[in-house]
UniProtKB/Swiss-Prot annotation:
Domain of life: Bacteria
Organism for this UniProt entry: Granulibacter bethesdensis (strain ATCC BAA-1260 / CGDNIH1)
Classification of source organism: Bacteria, Pseudomonadati, Pseudomonadota, Alphaproteobacteria, Acetobacterales
Encoding gene (name): mntH
UniProt keyword annotation of rRNA-binding present: no
Family assignment from sequence similarity: Belongs to the NRAMP family.
Any one GO MF annotation of this record: cadmium ion transmembrane transporter activity
Location in the cell: Cell inner membrane
Record-given protein name: Divalent metal cation transporter MntH
Function as written in the Swiss-Prot or TrEMBL entry: H(+)-stimulated, divalent metal cation uptake system.
Keywords: Cell inner membrane, Cell membrane, Ion transport, Membrane, Symport, Transmembrane, Transmembrane helix, Transport
Length: 444
């Protein structure tokens, strides 16, 4: 394998303008400073972070909090740290090589392996879109007292409208997604002031690993699937690839990677806190007396008498915002996956239309919407090792990465994280076939 000189080929989706690229170049060279300059580097991780607060997180976090209280907060924290590591590696890969992860897979793997990776990634993208689309539709249906199908149609129309911002340029899309992320964060900040939280118990559970039974393990695996997202790993490399055009040598690429790492830490720390807030809210509101709450609709109807109409409305607003924004980001990732792996690009409206079809089929077939959300997260968890292993492989090769190759410790930690995810998936499959895990009690 020979080292690739960054080509900075634009990925699918919006691109940065020449003006933004020039401002980035000046900032990287140290010719401009200040908070406005810092905001230039905010974008890729913000867009990727929306994948970590999508409706799938709502479903799994509600189940975790209502059934096990604060017990599984440590899983959320650990999954968020793993997500930070792999999003940082993905961004570094895009900056160092000027290529995104699907493109590198296509260039360096055999054709059968590329096709297999593409199929796995497309299945994961559809599972992702199922969760995102259904989440937004459920929120709209509950808030405005609509049939779920009408909520799905409304979600589709809003998503199509937001995707039009792609034509306005990369920064416009970043600002739109950033505003939606901020809305979700503010909603859960408000919930924390309403819910009666035992902060000491929550803090202790965050640093104390414990799995009470087999169902807890299943939910924990779902949390990992909802927090570390395959399409976000692929997408971030392409979003960072856009920024690579502003870095013309190794020194400037090194500075750009440093800025990128800071953004990843900030954006995903916010996403992690939102996820922990979801579990804390569910634990505080439902665990004592309402531990059977496992569905989004149940959570909404139970919140109203427990914490008031305002808390229930805030919950729905955050769910709608999450579903619509993550659906837009999922479509962007789907474009990148298809073009990167098999060099096929279809119009964004057609991509959006195709990925919506499974959601309509699931609901028309009578499948419970929240069950579909949780199952989609398990599918994502099973699909996740493919991009994780590919990312470790490429970012650990000096011939490809040059001076930006992973440090040996980074490579070990990333490999250990991937092994943990693989292990969780194997346990999940064993449970799915009706076998029990020795030493792990079955839930009552």
């Amino acid at each position: 394998m020979t080292q690739i000189t960054p080509t900075c080929a634009p990925p699918p989706g919006p691109t940065i303008t020449d003006r933004t690229s020039l401002r980035l170049s000046k900032a990287i060279a140290g010719k401009s400073r200040g908070w406005k300059t810092g905001l230039l580097f905010a974008g890729p991780a913000v867009i990727a972070s929306i994948a970590y607060v999508d409706p799938g997180n709502f479903a799994t976090n509600i189940q975790a909090g209502s059934r096990y209280g604060y017990t599984l907060l440590w899983v959320v924290a650990a999954a968020n740290l793993i997500a930070m590591l792999f999003q940082a590696l993905s961004a570094k890969l895009g900056i160092a090589t000027g290529r995104n992860l699907p493109e590198l897979c296509r260039d360096h793997f055999s054709r059968p392996l590329v096709i297999a990776l593409w199929i796995i990634s497309e299945i994961a993208a559809m599972a992702t879109d199922l969760a995102e689309f259904l989440g937004g539709a459920i929120g709209l249906a509950l808030l405005f007292r609509l049939p779920l199908i009408i909520g799905m149609v409304a979600t589709a129309m809003i998503t199509f409208a937001l995707l039009l911002f792609e034509k306005r340029g990369y920064r416009v899309m970043e600002l739109v997604i950033g505003a939606l992320v901020a809305t979700i964060g503010l909603c859960y900040l408000a919930e924390m002031f309403i819910a009666p939280v035992d902060w000491t118990a929550a803090a202790w559970a965050t640093i104390t690993p414990r799995l009470p039974d087999a169902t807890a393990l299943t939910i924990a695996t779902g949390i990992v699937g909802a927090t570390v997202m395959p399409h976000a790993v692929y997408l971030h490399s392409g979003l960072a690839q856009n920024r690579a055009a502003a870095a013309t040598d190794d020194a400037s690429r090194h500075r750009l990677i440093r800025f990128s790492n800071r953004e990843v830490i900030l954006a995903l720390a916010l996403a992690g806190m939102v996820n922990m807030a979801m579990v804390i809210m569910a634990a505080s509101a439902f665990h004592i007396g309402h531990s059977d709450v496992a569905e989004i609709e149940q959570a909404y109807h139970t919140l109203t008498p427990l914490l008031g109409a305002a808390a229930a409305a805030i919950f729905l607003i955050s769910l709608i915002t999450s579903g619509i924004s993550s659906s837009v980001v999922g479509t962007m990732a789907g474009q990148m996956i298809m073009q990167g792996f098999v060099h096929i690009r279809i119009p964004v409206w057609l991509r959006r239309l195709v990925t919506m079809v499974p959601a309509f089929i699931v609901i028309l077939a009578g499948v419970n919407a929240t069950d579909a959300l949780v199952i989609s997260q398990v599918i994502l968890s099973i699909a996740l090792p493919a991009p994780m292993i590919a990312l470790i492989y490429f970012s650990g090769h000096r011939e490809l990465m040059g001076p930006f190759v992973n440090h040996r410790v980074t490579q070990w930690v990333a490999s250990a994280a991937a092994a943990i995810v693989l292990g969780l998936n194997m346990v999940l499959l064993i449970q799915a076939f009706g076998f029990t895990i020795p030493g792990l009690p079955v839930a009552p």
